[in-house]
Amino acid sequence: MADELIIGDKALTSRLFIGTGKFASHEIMGQAVSQSGAQVVTVALRRVDLDNPQESELKFIPAGCVLMPNTSGARTAEEAVKIARIARAAGCGNWVKIEVVTDQRYLLPDNYETVKATEILAKEGFVVLPYMNPDLMVAKRLKEAGAAAIMPLGAPIGSNRGLKTREMIRILIEEIDLPIIVDAGIGKPSEAMEAMEMGAAAVLVNTAIATARDPVAMARAFSMAVEAGRMAYLAGLAPTREYAEASSPLTGFLV
């Protein structure tokens, strides 16, 4: 059986989600997405010309990808809901990544407003993937509100600082019966692989790919890292030990 990630009505074989911001051009973005094999692509609605969407970056996203508009720029649940409704009305589908940010220095998500927006949009039939500051109680409330998956940050968005919240993410993976998709802060393929080895369902990467010297090659590197991390998780990582343990007998062969 294929190792598929089921979210909403989609069965995904790629566990790398890609953001479309910060690329030098739409053409490079499209090439990077294509080389990565990603099936879910997130885009900020405020960058899309809704009067002529086919002349925006949407034109360069490979056919067959699931488009996941995000509510970047929303400061309240009400603003996030409004953006999501506009996206669906414009033909962008019913997937939405909820981003509600009131902190303008670290761009940390407002978990309280995120729960409110999730509950409203889930009731309206959206497939809601909320971006959140990792917190077990909030994650439980997001699940109760109807989230299809939960997207905790690894580090502040765009920072490329890696999995600074790894222990909190590990708790969510253990305790929440929903796909946990690590979003924000991942700066290296090795960090994406670590998230997958921990048991994350997927990772979302943007800045680390878009701002690399060769974004297309970096997208491929992340794809391979995510695949390797998932394979390692399914294979079962060997336990760590405090002391050394020889792989071959140390006594008896000289007798």
From Swiss-Prot:
Gene Ontology, cellular component aspect: cytoplasm
Q: Where in the cell is it found?
A: Cytoplasm
Q: Spell out the protein name for this chain.
A: Thiazole synthase
Q: Please list the residues that bind 1-deoxy-D-xylulose 5-phosphate.
A: 158, 184-185, 206-207
Which InterPro entries does the protein's record reference?
Aldolase_TIM, Thiazole_synthase_ThiG, ThiG
Taxonomic placement: Bacteria, Bacillati, Bacillota, Clostridia, Moorellales
> Gene3D superfamilies, from UniProt?
Aldolase class I
- EC number(s) from the headed UniProt entry: 2.8.1.10
Similarity field: Belongs to the ThiG family.
| Pathway given in the UniProt record | Cofactor biosynthesis; thiamine diphosphate biosynthesis
- The main enzyme category here is transferase
Cite the active-site annotation. 97 (schiff-base intermediate with dxp)
This protein's UniProt keywords: Cytoplasm, Schiff base, Thiamine biosynthesis, Transferase
Where mainly found?
cytoplasm
Superkingdom of origin organism: Bacteria
Q: Which GO terms describe its molecular function?
A: thiazole synthase activity
**Quaternary structure (record):** Homotetramer. Forms heterodimers with either ThiH or ThiS.
Q: Which GO terms describe its biological process?
A: thiamine diphosphate biosynthetic process
